[in-house]
Regions:
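Bacterial Sec-dependent N-terminal signal peptides
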Residues: 1-29
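Glycan-recognition and catalytic cores of secretory/periplasmic carbohydrate-active enzymes
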Residues: 24-420
Length: 420
């Protein structure tokens, strides 16, 4: 089942004071400004991509300062068309609907790909939003076919969807034969939605199994932080390793990983109504809200435990690298969106905490400290995100998924508080 926002929760939320502004109206104006900025940045970017880089999608900035774009097979390919759909949804601007459809169609063949667990990111952010906003059957069919492709990666023995093909772990010692990453919680939405659209409960059952195993094995229940990678024995389903690939240490908390978990278990509650998911999502959120390591502006460092005693890094860092501590705007954007939805299902006191934190994140992201000036940042919206610090990949740069979840969070705020 797909849960609607409870009326009592919405009424309670509407009464909350907007924490980052003098008034509800001021936050709404900030949201309007963000989407105006998005239109000014993305229209020339879309035009340039169509004219000069057909078939590719913008994602980030390369070390040499040029735009980094990707082919449709990249795991991040769905975020730019998804952002265009969100701009169209917020503004009603038909030009952005045309842009969104154009870039969404680039991904059509990806519905048949079975070599990636990221089909949820790729196809639901693009085709899922396309179907939601247009109702076109062709988009619906692509969503269901994509879910069928994703389901081929599910192992009944493990009870999870395999994230990556077998590889040597980040420490250069472990052999990972069935690695599952916390990010994979985000791809469950594609499976849940496919059951809703097709009536085939197989997808739903796979998603629930994956979520339940993740809840048991990815979460440290003593403090509700998360592991990035859990490697399973592909035959017995036993846990063999709990590690990291993108975090500071195996026992540290990678900031975006925690964000994926909050968002992922919230969407599981939306589709199932299982209170275990609601409870775990709130505990995961509490880890962030009450964390003394969360900076004053609520935009987390790339990992919550960088350089701390008791956390042995997965690679050797210089003192300068440890001291660098770049922020990850993408983690904040994902958390803000997830927390706003979670607030609609939570009791009034917890909802107030969630909304206040999400609003603080969105206010920071909307400030000049994180939002690029029009014409700068290769026309991406947000600055200062991190993909994978341990391997030096995309550090302190814009990222397409930071923009996507930022726009989604602003849309959710407006829907909850009645501005849209």
């Amino acid at each position: 089942m797909k849960k609607a926002f409870p009326l009592c929760a919405i009424v309670a939320l509407v009464t909350l004071a907007v924490s980052c502004a003098d008034s509800h109206n001021k936050f709404a104006k900030m949201s309007d400004k963000a989407f105006e900025n998005a239109m000014e940045q993305y229209a020339p970017l879309a035009d340039s991509m169509i004219a000069n880089r057909p078939g590719r999608l913008p994602h980030s900035i390369k070390p040499d300062g040029t735009l980094a774009d990707v082919p449709p097979i990249s795991w991040v390919s769905g975020f730019f068309p998804g952002s265009l759909w969100y701009i169209y949804e917020y503004t009603g601007n038909e030009a952005f609907k045309a842009y969104a459809e154009h870039f969404t169609h680039y991904l059509k063949k990806i519905q048949y790909v079975t070599k990636t667990h990221d089909l949820g990111f790729m196809m639901y952010c693009s085709y899922g939003n396309a179907y939601r906003l247009t109702g076109k059957e062709e988009y619906k069919d692509v969503v269901v076919t994509s879910a069928k492709s994703l389901s081929t990666r599910f192992s009944p023995a493990v009870g999870c969807i395999k994230s990556w093909e077998p590889r040597v772990g980040c420490n250069g010692v472990d052999q990972w034969d069935f690695p599952v990453i916390i990010d994979n919680m985000m791809n469950l939405e594609l499976l849940f939605e496919a059951t809703r659209l097709s009536g085939d409960s197989t997808f739903h059952k796979m998603a629930v199994s994956h979520a339940n195993n993740t809840m048991q094995n990815h979460i440290r229940h003593e403090d509700y932080s998360t592991y990035h990678v859990v490697n399973y024995n592909p035959t017995t389903g036993a846990v063999e390793h709990q590690r990291t690939q993108q975090g500071f240490a195996d026992n540290s908390t990678w900031s975006r990983g925690q964000a994926w978990a909050i968002y992922g278990f919230t969407l599981c509650y939306r589709y199932t109504g299982d209170v275990a998911y609601l409870e775990i999502a709130n505990k995961l959120a509490d880890f962030v809200i009450d964390n003394p390591r969360l900076p004053e502006d609520a935009i987390p460092v790339w990992d919550y435990n960088v350089g701390e005693e008791g956390f042995v890094p997965v690679k050797e860092y210089t003192p300068e690298q440890i001291a660098q501590k770049p922020r990850d705007a993408s983690a904040a954007a994902v958390m803000a969106s997830g927390m706003l939805e979670l607030a609609t299902y939570s009791n009034e006191a917890q909802a107030a905490r969630l909304v206040a934190t999400a609003e603080k994140m969105l206010c920071s992201l909307s400030s000049k400290n994180y939002t690029a000036k029009v014409g700068e940042n290769k026309r991406m919206l947000l600055m200062h995100s991190v993909t994978a610090f341990p391997i030096g990949r995309e550090i302190d740069v814009p990222l397409s998924y930071a923009d996507y979840y930022y726009l989604e969070a602003l849309l959710r705020w407006n829907k909850i508080f009645g501005a849209k």
